[in-house]
C-alpha cells in the first residue's frame, strides 16, 4: 500500500510518485486563472461600486444589481469582461508566487521527523506568502482596477488600455515605473487580513456549529463554516480593499494626487460618502470569494489527476 511507503521515498518503480514542485506552482496559477474567467464580472461590479460616488459625486449605481444591468445595457456582454487579461495576469503572478512561497516555508519549518508547523506558525506562513504574492501581483492589480473603471468615465477621460500588457507599458512610460506598485501597501495588507480572517473565522465557525449540536463534522458543516468565514473575511477586508481601489485608480490633479495616503482615503470616504460606504461592493465581493475558491480547487484537482494519468501512471 502507498500509505506504508517511507516518507522520504520520492520514486516508485523508477517514476516520481508526485508531480514536481514547478508543476504544482504552474497548476496553482492556471487553476486561479481558470476560476477568474468565471468570476471576472463580479470583480468588475465590485470595482465599479467602490468607485461610484467618489469625491461626493452622485452615485452612478444604487446597488450591485443595478451596476450589473447598467454595464450590460451601456457596454454590452463584452463589457462585463473588461480587464479579463489583467485579472488573468494577477492570478498568474499572485497565486503562483503565494503558492511557491507557502510551500517553501512550510517545508523549511517542518520538523526533521515530519511534524508539520503548528497552527500559529502556519498562519504566519500563510500571511507572509499572501503579502509577498500581493507585492508581486500589484502591477497587474493596478492595470485591472484601471481597466475595469474605464467604462464608467466619459469617452474623453478614458485611459483606453487595449490589454494588460499595453496598460503596464503605458503606465510605466507615462507615469513612471513606481506607479506600477501604487497601492502595494494596502494590497499587501488586504492579503494579510484575508489570510488571517479566513484562518481564524473558519476554525471558530466550525467549532461553533459543532458545539450547537445541530451539525456533525461533515461536508454540510464545512460548507456552512466556509460561508460564515467568507462573510467575516469580506467584512474585515473591504475597508482595506476600497483604499487599494481608490489609490490605484486615482489621477494627478494640478500635479497633486487625489489622495495623500490610505488614511486620507478612509477619512474622505467616511466624510463625503458615509461610514458604510467603506463596504461598497460587499455583495459581489462576497459572491466572488466562494466560487473562486471552489473553482480553483476543482481545476487544480483535475490538472493534478490528468498529470498523474499521463506522466506518473504505468
From Swiss-Prot:
Membrane disposition: Multi-pass membrane protein
Record flagged with keyword Repeat: yes
Primary localization class, coarse: mitochondrion
MF (Gene Ontology): oxoglutarate:malate antiporter activity
BP-aspect Gene Ontology terms: gluconeogenesis; lipid transport; malate-aspartate shuttle
Sequence positions bearing Phosphotyrosine: 102
Modified residues (N6-succinyllysine): 57
Catalytic reaction equation(s): (S)-malate(in) + 2-oxoglutarate(out) = (S)-malate(out) + 2-oxoglutarate(in); malonate(in) + 2-oxoglutarate(out) = malonate(out) + 2-oxoglutarate(in); succinate(in) + 2-oxoglutarate(out) = succinate(out) + 2-oxoglutarate(in); maleate(in) + 2-oxoglutarate(out) = maleate(out) + 2-oxoglutarate(in)
UniProt modified residues of type N-acetylalanine: 2
InterPro entries: Mito_Metabolite_Transporter (IPR050391), Mitochondrial_sb/sol_carrier (IPR018108), Mt_carrier_dom_sf (IPR023395)
Domain of life: Eukaryota
GO terms for cellular component: mitochondrial inner membrane; mitochondrion
Transmembrane helix recorded as keyword: yes
Transmembrane segments: 24-42, 83-101, 119-140, 183-202, 222-240, 281-300
Subunit text: Interacts with SMIM26.
Role, per record: Catalyzes the transport of 2-oxoglutarate (alpha-oxoglutarate) across the inner mitochondrial membrane in an electroneutral exchange for malate. Can also exchange 2-oxoglutarate for other dicarboxylic acids such as malonate, succinate, maleate and oxaloacetate, although with lower affinity. Contributes to several metabolic processes, including the malate-aspartate shuttle, the oxoglutarate/isocitrate shuttle, in gluconeogenesis from lactate, and in nitrogen metabolism. Maintains mitochondrial fusion and fission events, and the organization and morphology of cristae.
Family label: Belongs to the mitochondrial carrier (TC 2.A.29) family.
Protein name: Mitochondrial 2-oxoglutarate/malate carrier protein
Amino acid at each position: 500500500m502507498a500509505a506504508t511507503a517511507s516518507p522520504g521515498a520520492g520514486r516508485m518503480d523508477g517514476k516520481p510518485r508526485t508531480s514536481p514542485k514547478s508543476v504544482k506552482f504552474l497548476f496553482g496559477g492556471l487553476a486561479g486563472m481558470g476560476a477568474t474567467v468565471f468570476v471576472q464580472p463580479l470583480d468588475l461590479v465590485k470595482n465599479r461600486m467602490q468607485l461610484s460616488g467618489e469625491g461626493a459625486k452622485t452615485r452612478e449605481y444604487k446597488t450591485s444589481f443595478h451596476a450589473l444591468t447598467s454595464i450590460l445595457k451601456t457596454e454590452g456582454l463584452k463589457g462585463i469582461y473588461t480587464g479579463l487579461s489583467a485579472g488573468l495576469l494577477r492570478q498568474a503572478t499572485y497565486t503562483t508566487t503565494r503558492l511557491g512561497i507557502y510551500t517553501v516555508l512550510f517545508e523549511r519549518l517542518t520538523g526533521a521527523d515530519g511534524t508539520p508547523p503548528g497552527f500559529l506558525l502556519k498562519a504566519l506562513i500563510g500571511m507572509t506568502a499572501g503579502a509577498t504574492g500581493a507585492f508581486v501581483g500589484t502591477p497587474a492589480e493596478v492595470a485591472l482596477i484601471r481597466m475595469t473603471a474605464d467604462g464608467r468615465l466619459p469617452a474623453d477621460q478614458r485611459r483606453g488600455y487595449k490589454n494588460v500588457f499595453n496598460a503596464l507599458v503605458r503606465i510605466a512610460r507615462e507615469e513612471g515605473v513606481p506607479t506600477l506598485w501604487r497601492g502595494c501597501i494596502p494590497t499587501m495588507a488586504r492579503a494579510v487580513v484575508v489570510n488571517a480572517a479566513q484562518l481564524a473565522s473558519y476554525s471558530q465557525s466550525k467549532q461553533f456549529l459543532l458545539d450547537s449540536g445541530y451539525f456533525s463534522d461533515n461536508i454540510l458543516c464545512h460548507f456552512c463554516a466556509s460561508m460564515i468565514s467568507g462573510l467575516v473575511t469580506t467584512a474585515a477586508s473591504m475597508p482595506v480593499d476600497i483604499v487599494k481601489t481608490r489609490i490605484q485608480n486615482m489621477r494627478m490633479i494640478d500635479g497633486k494626487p487625489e489622495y495623500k495616503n490610505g488614511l486620507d482615503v478612509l477619512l474622505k470616504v467616511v466624510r463625503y460618502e458615509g461610514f458604510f460606504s467603506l463596504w461598497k461592493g460587499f455583495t459581489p465581493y462576497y459572491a466572488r470569494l466562494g466560487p473562486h475558491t471552489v473553482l480553483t480547487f476543482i481545476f487544480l484537482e483535475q490538472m493534478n489527476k490528468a498529470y498523474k494519468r499521463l506522466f506518473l501512471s504505468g
